[in-house]
Amino acid sequence: MPLLDSFKVDHTRMNAPAVRIAKTMQTPKGDNITVFDLRFCIPNKEILSSKGIHTLEHLFAGFMRDHLNNEQVEIIDISPMGCRTGFYMSLIGTPNEQQVAEAWLISMQDILNIKNQDEIPELNEYQCGTYTEHSLEEAQNIAQNILHRGVGINKNEDLLLDDNLLNS
């Protein structure tokens, strides 16, 4: 089985919160697609709560679209990582890490501005597979933590795993 790009970086050296360009590719028609690693937590040291990450999933994508989409950028998807340390964001376009970090911070402030759980979009049994597993309070705690710590930038060249580790 081929090794996925996300497993070629050393998770012990990742900073968080931080943005990383995980992958870039071009469609057959020439559109640029960029996948970002939006790392909320230091891998193997911190983890996002289940209810908090689920509520973030419902809120974060909409707010990021509000602040990042433009004539050159369109977000395709923002999905939580299985390890619960962040999200992957796939988009059409090539914004830089700083633009993404700024949109992320503004989105976290937007989450703090939500007054009650009724404002969470798609929070019902028809549109959500586990609609009872949400916590606005936990999502807001995560957002506050991001705003308090700030968002840095992780570079792939600083995180590449040594070939000996890849083959062990």
UniProtKB/Swiss-Prot annotation:
It comes from the Bacteria. Binds 1 Fe cation per subunit. InterPro entries: LuxS_sf, Metalloenz_LuxS/M16, S-ribosylhomocysteinase. It catalyses: S-(5-deoxy-D-ribos-5-yl)-L-homocysteine = (S)-4,5-dihydroxypentane-2,3-dione + L-homocysteine. Its EC number is 4.4.1.21. GO terms for molecular function: iron ion binding; S-ribosylhomocysteine lyase activity. Its cofactor is Fe cation. Keywords: Autoinducer synthesis, Iron, Lyase, Metal-binding, Quorum sensing. It holds the Pfam family LuxS. GO terms for biological process: quorum sensing. Fe cation binds at residues 54, 58, 128. Belongs to the LuxS family. Involved in the synthesis of autoinducer 2 (AI-2) which is secreted by bacteria and is used to communicate both the cell density and the metabolic potential of the environment. The regulation of gene expression in response to changes in cell density is called quorum sensing. Catalyzes the transformation of S-ribosylhomocysteine (RHC) to homocysteine (HC) and 4,5-dihydroxy-2,3-pentadione (DPD). Homodimer. This is S-ribosylhomocysteine lyase. It comes from Histophilus somni (strain 129Pt) (Haemophilus somnus).
